[in-house]
């Protein structure tokens, strides 16, 4: 799970009411949760505003569950899950979904793979049949595997190999971690993509695509007991599997700054900072989110104002916090003007970060960050898709969906002193990895 911000402004709630009225999140008493005998965790949030349903199937499998030689497998299943089962042909999942007026998508991260469906309430039985079918009887057809292997290799070239920002991020992340599997790229290393064996796929699927490793979320126009009965009918017969081994690797303390320098065909230099940061469930989480917001969210953020508008040292700033199961990274990334002196930009950036670490942010900056966070939370919660996503995030990453309904209050409680303490802990030069990409003909 990533919380990302660019330099584009977002609507800001009024300074008074938005952050004072955040404590009451409706819907807590409507949500129903149940765990099937096979371990499948099911959460249902009935919302009858429109006759539609959002389904999120969270699989606890990401690049953190991989190893050298099989990197990219979690992402590969994002492709394979749409390519046939014992009962259905490749592409039939999409065709049946679209025939009902529905749509679907999926994404993979360092920690999870998530499958998303949006459909009319009348299609609930069919969609649960489709979803359970591909968990129970996914097909492993060699020709399909080879075809999708080529698709993933092309995707990697587009997103990483031929994308300077993506390539630099991959190299920075691989340098930031020395022991933990977060060092692996989600899409996989090129040599691994070309060498997965069918046995690797089958072993990974059996281990992680088991009901006791899934969390199924339904939000929308459903009656909970009827929906639970349908889930039981379709998913109940799927046997649980032996739980995956717990990951034992723990990233050692980083003792000094690490640096990555790439020379590539490029119009403009790029600069990235990746600081070691807490896991999603860490109590400091709200303060980390607000810190990132004050730094890079919107045109009035600290770094946009200082580096883009005032000093003209960057054309764009952004950032994200990888909120994972384990401690991850807080990223800052800057796109620089042509011909920039990267060292000059770094000095200016370090000056701003040192000031925040030493003195915190102003009261106005913190209020603004809280308002923007509250506005974003309520915008997402206004849709059934947002409800399904947030319910899943809190159940999977925070261990309890009930924490969703206390989230706005937790953000509101963050004090300037707490934010400054978190800033001083995270924005430590000894715990960061710096990535620089310069044009090939640059003297940097």
Which residue stretches match the model-derived regions?
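Short acidic/His-enriched helical or mixed secondary-structure segments at domain edges of catalytic enzymes
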Residues: 153-171, 250-269, 306-316, 325-327, ...
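M16/insulysin-pitrilysin zinc metalloprotease superfamily fold
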Residues: 84-87, 118-151, 299, 318, ...
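His/Glu-based metal-binding/catalytic segments typifying zinc-dependent metallopeptidases
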Residues: 47, 56-58, 157, 174, ...
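C-terminal regions of mature proteins
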Residues: 2-24, 31, 215-217, 334-335, ...
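Scaffold signal of the M16-like zinc-metallopeptidase fold and its non-catalytic homologs
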Residues: 2-15, 83-85, 127, 159-210, ...
């Amino acid at each position: 799970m990533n919380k990302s911000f660019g330099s584009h402004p977002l609507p800001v709630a009024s300074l008074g009411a938005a952050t004072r009225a955040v404590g009451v999140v409706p819907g807590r008493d409507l949500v129903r949760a149940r765990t099937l005998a096979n371990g499948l965790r099911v959460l249902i949030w009935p919302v009858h505003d429109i006759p539609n349903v959002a389904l999120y199937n969270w699989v606890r499998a990401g690049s953190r569950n991989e190893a050298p030689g099989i990197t990219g497998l979690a992402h590969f299943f994002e492709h394979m899950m749409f390519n046939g089962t014992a009962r259905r042909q490749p592409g039939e999942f999409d065709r049946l979904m679209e025939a009902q007026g529905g749509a679907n998508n999926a994404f993979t991260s360092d920690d999870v793979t998530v499958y998303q469906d949006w459909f009319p309430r009348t299609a609930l039985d069919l969609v649960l049949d489709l979803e359970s079918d591909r968990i129970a009887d996914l097909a492993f057809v060699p020709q399909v595997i080879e075809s999708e292997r080529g698709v993933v290799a092309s995707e990697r070239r587009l997103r990483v190999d031929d994308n300077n920002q993506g390539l630099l991020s991959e190299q920075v992340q691989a340098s930031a971690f020395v022991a933990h599997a977060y060092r692996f790229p989600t899409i996989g290393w090129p040599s691994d993509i070309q060498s997965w064996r069918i046995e690797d796929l089958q072993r990974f699927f059996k281990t992680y695509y088991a009901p006791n490793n899934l969390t199924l979320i339904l939000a929308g126009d459903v009656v909970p007991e009827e929906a639970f009965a349908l889930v039981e009918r379709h998913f109940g017969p799927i046997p649980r599997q032996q739980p995956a081994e717990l990951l034992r690797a723990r990233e050692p303390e980083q003792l000094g700054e690490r640096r990555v320098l790439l020379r590539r065909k490029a119009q403009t230099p790029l600069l990235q900072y990746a600081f070691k940061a807490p896991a999603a469930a860490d109590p400091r989480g709200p303060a980390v989110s607000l810190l990132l917001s004050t730094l890079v969210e919107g045109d009035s953020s600290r770094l946009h104002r200082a580096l883009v508008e005032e000093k003209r040292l960057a054309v764009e700033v952004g950032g994200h916090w990888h909120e994972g199961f384990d401690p991850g990274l807080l990223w800052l990334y800057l796109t620089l003007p042509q011909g920039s002196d990267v060292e000059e930009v770094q000095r200016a950036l370090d000056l701003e970060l040192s000031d925040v670490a030493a003195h915190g942010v102003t009261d106005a900056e913190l209020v603004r960050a809280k308002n923007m966070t509250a506005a974003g939370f309520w915008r997402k919660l206004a849709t059934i898709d947002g409800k399904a996503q947030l319910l899943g995030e809190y159940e999977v990453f925070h261990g309890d969906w009930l924490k969703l309904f206390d989230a706005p209050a937790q953000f509101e409680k963050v004090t300037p002193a707490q934010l400054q303490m978190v800033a001083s802990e995270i924005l430590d030069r000894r715990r960061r990895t710096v990535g620089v990409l310069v044009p090939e003909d640059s003297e940097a």
